From Swiss-Prot:
A GO molecular function held by the record: RNA binding
Organism for this UniProt entry: Campylobacter jejuni subsp. jejuni serotype O:23/36 (strain 81-176)
Catalytic class of the enzyme: isomerase
Reaction equation(s) it catalyzes: uridine(55) in tRNA = pseudouridine(55) in tRNA
Gene of this entry: truB
Protein name per its UniProtKB record: tRNA pseudouridine synthase B
Protein family (similarity comment): Belongs to the pseudouridine synthase TruB family. Type 1 subfamily.
Active site location: 38 (nucleophile)
Keywords: Isomerase, tRNA processing
Length: 272
């Protein structure tokens, strides 16, 4: 069964554990997801079954929108509601001051990923090292903050909605935000509400061609796609280099054009 949909991962489950529940629910062993959510986080997780598990790299998954609660005055090794080492009662901040920092932290931001993250260090996940008390040497990264707004402030909890690029860490944003205030802070909750155009809709099966980040191309002899026959660039409507999808009534294929040569990236993927 080919299927792609937006699931809602609950808090307290790893993304892998949640995927296992979906495999059992839909009786489908070939399944995958994109965009790992930490166990303490909840929200939209893109899930695919069957041949559609090969399509993640072609999906438009950015920007991503989250709702987050920053717990001001708290020091956590993992920047979430676990591994808390210190809780301080700090003075309440002026809302205008908080808004000023929000405004400053727009655009491209440099950051270091959290020690408790899925980044790999010589094949080992950083969080596995962190659990053993080993500090990983994580390289600085960049994320783009497209928009951020304050939803509410009930000291010491600051609720925000933030839209960011793929690969961004909201925990790192929280750390940088707190640093500008001269305090520690951690996330007490995190929910992903949107990933690209994907929003939760009761696990409704989606038309994947509306969600892939590719332009359509066209060929007169559609039977070539059905048979996986060699395609020449002159047979296509568009000749510019790049990736495209071509569809028939029941199937679609993804091709690449480079140096006047056409290559199948995926062929004869059945529509759901």
């Amino acid at each position: 069964m080919n299927k792609i949909f937006a699931a809602f991962k609950p808090r307290g489950l790893s993304s892998n554990a949640f995927l296992s529940t979906l495999k059992k629910k839909y009786k489908n062993k070939k399944a995958g997801y994109s965009g790992t959510l930490d166990p303490f986080a909840k929200g939209v997780l893109i899930v695919a079954f069957g041949q559609y598990t090969k399509l993640f790299r072609f999906l438009k998954k950015t920007p991503k929108t989250y709702k987050a609660t920053l717990w001001l005055g708290v020091y956590s090794l993992s920047l979430d509601d676990q591994n808390i080492k210190e809780i301080k009662n700090i003075k309440e901040f002026d809302l205008a001051n908080l808004q000023q920092i929000i405004d400053q932290m727009q655009g491209i931001i440099s950051y270091t990923p959290p020690q408790f993250s899925a980044k790999r260090i010589n094949g080992t996940r950083a969080y596995e090292l962190a659990k053993k008390g080993i500090e990983a040497n994580l390289k600085p990264c960049q994320m783009e903050v497209f928009d951020c707004k304050i939803l509410s402030y009930n000291h010491p909890f600051l609720n925000i909605e933030i839209t960011v690029s793929e690969g961004a860490y909201i925990r790192s944003y929280c750390e940088l935000f707190a640093r500008k205030l001269g305090i520690n802070a951690t996330l007490s909750s995190l929910e992903r509400i949107k990933e690209g155009k994907f929003v939760y809709n009761n696990e409704k099966s989606l038309n994947v061609l509306k969600y892939i980040d590719l332009k359509p191309n066209f060929i007169k002899e559609l039977n070539k796609l059905e048979n996986g026959a060699k395609i020449f660039v002159e047979e296509l409507e568009f000749h510019d280099e790049g990736d495209y999808y071509i569809e028939t009534e029941k199937y679609f294929s993804i091709i690449n054009i480079k140096e006047n040569t056409v290559k199948y990236l995926l062929n004869k993927v059945e529509k759901c």
